[in-house]
Structure formats: C-alpha cells, structure tokens
C-alpha cells in the first residue's frame, strides 16, 4: 500500500497523510497557526451563495 502525500495548504511542502502526522494536512504547527490566523483575520472565508433558499427563511425572525 503506497503512502498518500498531500501538500501543506500554507507552504506546499509534501506531507504524508497518516495518523502519526500530528498537524495534517499542515506540515507543522507553524503552518497550522498561520492558517488559523488567516481565518481569524477574515483573510479566508467560505463563499456564500447569493439568494440562498435558507436566507429568506431567516429574515425577520430574530
């Protein structure tokens, strides 16, 4: 069975995908924290879908 190798989302270094890889998909704690900081600073976000069906259900129901 061959090893699965992924790229670190922060620095693109190869990371072996296995339970022992403590920071997977990141190569290190440093890269993991950089990514977390980008989310916290709202530099990254999940794109919203315009005219989402659920959005109209939530409007005016606070």
UniProtKB/Swiss-Prot annotation:
Signal peptide: none annotated. Keywords: Metal-binding, Zinc. Zn(2+) binds at residues 8, 11, 27, 31. Its cofactor is Zn(2+). It comes from the Bacteria. The keyword Metal-binding applies. It holds the Pfam family YacG. GO terms for biological process: regulation of DNA-templated transcription. Binds 1 zinc ion. One of its GO terms (molecular function) is zinc ion binding. Interacts with GyrB. NCBIfam families: PRK00418.1 (NF001638). Belongs to the DNA gyrase inhibitor YacG family. Inhibits all the catalytic activities of DNA gyrase by preventing its interaction with DNA. Acts by binding directly to the C-terminal domain of GyrB, which probably disrupts DNA binding by the gyrase. This is DNA gyrase inhibitor YacG.
């Amino acid at each position: 069975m061959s090893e699965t190798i992924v790229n670190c989302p922060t620095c693109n270094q190869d990371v072996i995908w296995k339970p022992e890889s403590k920071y997977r998909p990141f190569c290190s704690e440093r890269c993991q924290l950089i990514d977390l900081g980008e989310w916290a600073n709202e530099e990254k976000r999940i794109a919203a879908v315009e005219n989402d069906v659920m959005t109209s259900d939530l409007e005016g129901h606070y």
